[in-house]
A protein has these predicted regions:
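Acidic, PIN/NYN-like endoribonuclease modules and their adjacent C-terminal/linker elements
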Residues: 1, 67, 73, 104-135
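Short, well-structured N-terminal submotif of metal-dependent ribonuclease cores
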Residues: 1-36, 50-60, 131-135
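Phosphate- and divalent-cation-binding pockets in alpha/beta enzyme and binding domains
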Residues: 21, 43-44, 82, 119-120
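A short acidic, often aromatic-flanked loop/helix-cap motif at beta-alpha or helix-coil junctions
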Residues: 42, 78-81, 130-135
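Active-site-proximal, substrate-binding regions of enzyme catalytic domains
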Residues: 43-71, 78
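Active-site neighborhoods of divalent-metal-dependent phosphate/nucleic-acid chemistry enzymes
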Residues: 71-113
Length: 135
């Protein structure tokens, strides 16, 4: 089961250099085993709305998240110590520490292009790694 980091969605939304790798991942993945944090959705919402892409944001949430079966996870305030623990132990900023805490709490592998996760116990995988291990 996988927690998809914000930068994976940004690669897709902004059509960056690894967009095809991301598209391949989503077309091949069992989306019932794919998760996103509420923090990622909020971050993506900030980006969409800053660009005045209100309808595009709703389309993304409704079609790419809800209709596809991707699950949304969050942390309650009682679990926020897990964020600060990860930030302190692995020298992560808030968004990475939040993702790490969610992945750790729910037993998920982090799918990310962010090398900061390489400093953690859990590490990370990139979409391309998942293709190689399942061929």
């Amino acid at each position: 089961m996988f927690l998809i980091d914000t930068n994976i969605f940004l690669e897709y939304i902004l059509c960056r250099s690894r967009v095809q790798e991301v598209k391949d991942f989503f077309s091949r993945a069992d989306l019932s085993k794919v998760y996103v944090s509420d923090f990622s959705l909020h971050s993506l919402g900030v980006i969409y709305l800053r660009e005045r892409k209100l309808l595009e944001f709703l389309t993304f949430v409704n079609e790419d998240i809800i209709a596809s079966g991707i699950h949304v996870l969050s942390l309650v305030p009682d679990d926020f110590s897990k964020i600060t623990d990860a930030a302190g132990q692995f020298h992560l900023d808030f968004d990475d520490a939040y993702q790490y805490a969610v992945a750790e709490q729910y037993g998920l592998s982090i799918v990310s292009f962010d090398k900061d996760f390489d400093r953690t116990k859990m590490g990370r995988v990139v979409p391309e790694d998942l293709f190689r291990s399942h061929q």
